[in-house]
Swiss-Prot record:
It comes from Conus lividus (Livid cone). The lineage of its organism: Eukaryota, Metazoa, Spiralia, Lophotrochozoa, Mollusca. Disulfide bonds join C45-C59, C52-C63, C58-C68. Keywords: Cleavage on pair of basic residues, Disulfide bond, Knottin, Neurotoxin, Secreted, Signal, Toxin. This is Conotoxin LiC53. It is found in: Secreted. Residues 1-23 form the signal peptide.
Amino acid sequence: MEKLTSLLLVAALLMLTQTLIQGGGEDRPNKKFLQKIKSTAKRECTAPSGYCDYPEECCEVECGRHYCDWWY
C-alpha cells in the first residue's frame, strides 16, 4: 500500500512539473506583447505621414519608405 501511495505521489509530481514547464512557455509571448503595448503607450509616437526610421516609431500605422503610412 505504501508503494502505491509513493508511486501515485511521484506520478502527480511529474504531471505537475510537466504542466508548469508547458504553461510557462505559453505565457512568455503574451508578456512580451503586453510589454510592447505598455512601452509604446509611455513614449511619443509619430503621426501618419510623419518621418520614421523604424516601425515602432509610428502611431497605429506602418513605417514604409521612411514615412508613417496606413498602406505599408
